[in-house]
From Swiss-Prot:
Keywords: Calcium, Collagen, Complement activation lectin pathway, Complement pathway, Disulfide bond, Glycoprotein, Hydroxylation, Immunity, Innate immunity, Lectin, Mannose-binding, Metal-binding, Repeat, Secreted, Signal. This is Mannose-binding protein A. PANTHER family: MANNOSE-BINDING PROTEIN A (PTHR24024:SF35), PULMONARY SURFACTANT-ASSOCIATED PROTEIN A (PTHR24024). The helical collagen-like domains from three protein chains assemble into a coiled coil and mediate trimerization.
Length: 249
């Protein structure tokens, strides 16, 4: 009974005490920069990151300096060839060149030519014994082939020689001794019938005709051959006889 009669008094004391504490905190907040009132608590864990916001607009160029020049790019394909430009003006006359080197080379070349000429003379001497026959300043050679007169002329011309043409008894004998068979001579009357001429030009000055020759038998015998006995006979130029060429010795 006593407990129930004292209950109102106890409630009043609790309320009064709580009010006094709240009042004290409010007064303290007015005079202190930081005062913790009530029961102290700890901070919670950080929350999750929020979603990315929308993309912003492009900003203005910054005030930074221009960077250094980059490396050159790859070479492009070659272009088309342009048109030829106009002819330039004539240049000034140059100074005279140094000919001392040229003169030395020329002297050396002349020396080599002399050596070659000496060797060529030696070869000609060998040919005299192995391929031909020499008579004074002429060398007669043959390849041993039989052919028409036109081909004999061509062959000798290619060798820078002429068809063998004896102009005296000594040369006639030299050709006779060298030729193993009947041979053409460089004498014809193709231009004027009956008037025999040298193929190199000029009228014939020496002859050694066989008896009753030339007779132009059957007409068309415009060429001359040297028989094995050394006598001459006129014959058709289309016939084939030994080719003998004449070189200056």
């Amino acid at each position: 009974m006593l407990l129930f009669s004292s209950l109102p008094v106890l409630l009043l004391c609790v309320v009064t005490a709580s009010y006094s504490e709240i009042k004290t905190c409010e007064d303290a907040q007015k005079t202190c920069s930081v005062i913790t009132c009530g029961i102290p608590v700890t901070n919670g864990t950080p929350g999750r990151d929020g979603r990315d916001g929308p993309k912003g607009e492009k900003g203005e160029p910054g005030p930074g300096f221009r960077g250094s020049q980059g490396p050159p790019g790859k070479m492009g394909p070659p272009g088309n060839i342009g048109e030829t430009g106009p002819l330039g003006p004539k240049g000034q006359k140059g100074d005279p060149g140094d000919t001392s080197g040229v003169e030395a080379k020329l002297a050396n070349l002349e020396g080599q030519i002399r050596i070659l000429k000496s060797e060529l003379d030696h070869v000609k001497k060998l040919q005299t014994f192995s391929l031909g026959k020499k008579s004074r300043k002429k060398l007669y050679v043959t390849n041993g082939e039989m052919m028409p007169f036109s081909k004999v002329k061509t062959l000798c011309a290619e060798l820078q020689a002429t068809v063998a043409t004896p102009k005296n008894a000594e040369e006639n004998k030299a050709i006779q001794d060298m030729a193993p068979d009947v041979a053409f001579l460089g004498i014809t009357d193709e231009v004027t019938e009956g008037q025999f001429m040298y193929v190199t030009g000029g009228r014939m000055t020496y002859s050694n005709w066989k008896s009753n020759e030339p007779n132009d038998h059957g007409s068309g015998e415009d060429c001359v051959i040297l028989q094995r006995d050394g006598l001459w006979n006129d014959i058709s130029c289309s016939s084939s006889f030994l080719a003998v060429c004449e070189f200056p010795a």
